């Protein structure tokens, strides 16, 4: 694997982590909050 390809894959992986993790945490937080409001 060439260094540029390796860097590209790493940047994709980090980009995914940076987007997916906060989105997941946000969804969990919102769903928990929503549950509390309904009950």
UniProtKB/Swiss-Prot annotation:
Annotated localization: Cellular thylakoid membrane
InterPro entries membership: PSII_PsbX, PSII_PsbX_type_1_subfam
GO biological process, one term: photosynthesis
Gene Ontology CC: photosystem II; plasma membrane-derived thylakoid membrane
Membrane association type: Single-pass membrane protein
Cross-referenced Gene3D superfamilies: Single helix bin
Parts of the chain that traverse the membrane: 10-30
Domain of life: Bacteria
Keywords: Membrane, Photosynthesis, Photosystem II, Thylakoid, Transmembrane, Transmembrane helix
Role played: Involved in the binding and/or turnover of quinones at the Q(B) site of photosystem II (PSII). PSII is a light-driven water plastoquinone oxidoreductase, using light energy to abstract electrons from H(2)O, generating a proton gradient subsequently used for ATP formation.
Protein family according to the UniProt entry: Belongs to the PsbX family. Type 1 subfamily.
Quaternary structure and partners: PSII is composed of 1 copy each of membrane proteins PsbA, PsbB, PsbC, PsbD, PsbE, PsbF, PsbH, PsbI, PsbJ, PsbK, PsbL, PsbM, PsbT, PsbX, PsbY, PsbZ, Psb30/Ycf12, peripheral proteins PsbO, CyanoQ (PsbQ), PsbU, PsbV and a large number of cofactors. It forms dimeric complexes.
Protein name (Swiss-Prot/TrEMBL): Photosystem II reaction center protein X
Organism name: Nostoc sp. (strain PCC 7120 / SAG 25.82 / UTEX 2576)
Lineage: Bacteria, Bacillati, Cyanobacteriota, Cyanophyceae, Nostocales
């Amino acid at each position: 694997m060439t260094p540029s390809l390796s860097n590209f894959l790493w940047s994709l992986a980090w980009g995914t982590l940076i987007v997916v993790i906060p989105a997941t945490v946000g969804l969990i937080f919102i769903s928990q909050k929503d549950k509390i409001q309904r009950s």
